[in-house]
Amino acid sequence: MALAIFAINALLNISLFRPGAMPYRDSIELGYAAMARFFYLHPSPWGWNPWQYCGLPSQFIYLPGLQYMAATLAHLLPIEPTYLYRLLAATLACLGPSTVFLFMVYFTRQRWWALATALGYTLFSPLYSMVATIDRDRGNIQLPWRLLVFVKYGEGPHNAGLTLLPLALVAVWETCTNPKYWRLLLAAVLLAAIALTNWIAALALAFCALTMALTVIQLPGFRVERMAIAGLLAYGLACFWLTPTFIRTIAFNWPADAFNYHLQSQQQVLLWGLAGGLVVVRLAFKWLFPDELFTCFVALNTFGFGWVVLWFYQRGVNTLPESRRYALEFELFFLILIFEYFRLLLRRPRPVAIFCAVIPFVFLMQAAWPDAGRYLTQGFERRNPVPREQTIEYKLAAKLASLKPQGRVYASGGLRFRLNAWFEIAQVGGGFESGLRHRLPLVLAYQVRTGVNSGPGQETADAILALRAMGVEYIVVHGTKSREHYRDFTNPLKFEGALELVHREEDDSIYRVPFHSLAHLVRWDERLQWPRESKLPLLRPYVAAMDAFPKLTSAWSGSEFRISGAMEPDRLVAVPMSHDGGWRAKQGDQEIEILKDDLGFMMLRAKPARSAEIVMSYRGNAEAFAMAALSLLVWLGAFAWLRWPGFLGRFPGRARGLGPGMAKL
């Protein structure tokens, strides 16, 4: 049945498996696909990515799950990694109802109710009837909300994590009620897989584990400590990527990425309300329905995710960072709860129970049938991808590639997500900021688009200074009539007459910025500085030094960055590339010191020479290698211990009367 459910979902959404650009232009799907392409070409997780955000460690790009899988398969199959990412993400999105079916079968032992729930999840999104903002967001294409966010916004990793979530919950229950080690290992692998795929799904999984423990508190035979052991083992399996520094970086960046979230008094009240509500729901089930543990578990998750999501959509308040994104989890458990309500009422059919089931069912069908009917009959014409060559983003990217830039490009809007999915071109921006160790270049990029901190008449001059300081050679500006979705320049005409126009495509323009090299000599007082009392960094001396002689040349050679030229006394070599402790620089046979300026870029203390070459190489850092070694030991040990299933102890078996799931039948 699970395979049949997947087949139905795949046939209903066959357009998701086709190559090309999705009809929605605000999708960030190609931002994820660009990572798959990068890891296909540069598989080392401890390398350096020079193509985005003025450079960052490969490990800090994003969570690797789907992207590394697509990159690995691309070495085995004659398919582009970007398209393989699409196929993987679409497959996992269509598998969602199948894992819901398995989840329901496991916990209720009733296949037909499980099938009904899975089909309901396939065809119906209750969120459209509950949240006006979500209802307006679907436009002229009818898809379940989980698939619409995949198509419209590119939420492939979130859908993948959502698909794995029911399986992980089954595995966690199994390991807490059964002493066999292989169950614990399976649970740990699933937990690690979700944590390496999507942060939102990982946090949702942690919340579900909490509600599971709350549901079965004081239940004989359920060993919560095994849940904790599975979590620790999962971290050991995943710590090769989820290093302490990586987690800390994500944690500190997340509030800024989530529209400047702050834990203020309002958020604290809502969090206390969430905790209190969970206790109330659990006590209500304890007093009214003490035997219905599965229904209690689903109700707790429905309340928890619903609390976070509905406060955001109804009042505009974020209980957690990016509260709106938990709508997928809320809808999943809310729909399961709806079918669980009907299942329990009709388990022992009586007149009152039948009445209480039939009336809500009529209202449910009245709300669901129009959307389901439209979904089944709409066809694929409006959903089919279009050839990428027809999109304005690809035309601009291809033109940039033909210019063969030696410096960076400044690409904003949707182009910054898509550019590196097609071409290896260094850019100021990229796909996702969550892994950035320093964010000051983002401030400069925002200044270029908006001119917000410039004085009267200084907007263009300040923007050009910022571009040159970041090593930009070409900038793409989207006009007010551009087909690009994110037209984010406050004044798209600001560079007319100030920069050389290289190319114009419809209402999109490419300008050349004065550029010599990604390395130049500066005196100490010419370095990049940002005085505390100033809204903008001090850029003019740094940029003026670029035009002075002697000039340096720079180029990438494989994984090395080479700088050549005359090194003058009392001068530093300024390199507008993100500073990281994993960099090493050698001038000849001698290692030279790497400094950091106020914007987080590198400066090299070169030795005076009429002609010299500096070779910079990125070797990673000790923490990354130590955590990788630890993870390898955990993987080897975890599978070696399969030979000794009693190593972690044999805990009491299942709770009496519960069968393989929570529901008493």
Show the residue positions of the predicted features.
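Membrane-embedded transmembrane-helix bundle of lipid-linked glycan/lipid transferases
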Residues: 1-384, 389-390, 395-396, 423, ...
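Extracytoplasmic/lumenal acceptor-recognition loop(s) of multi-pass membrane glycoenzymes
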Residues: 38, 191, 359-387, 400-474, ...
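Ordered hydrophobic segments in well-structured contexts
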Residues: 408, 474-476, 508-520, 572-574, ...
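Short Gly/Ser/Thr- and Asp/Glu-enriched loop/turn motifs at secondary-structure junctions
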Residues: 414, 504-507, 597-599
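Short, aromatic/basic amphipathic alpha-helical patches
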Residues: 419, 484-498
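Active-site-proximal, structured, solvent-exposed surfaces of multi-pass membrane proteins
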Residues: 429, 536-654
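A SAM-dependent methyltransferase catalytic signature shared across enzymes that methylate proteins
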Residues: 494-501, 585-590
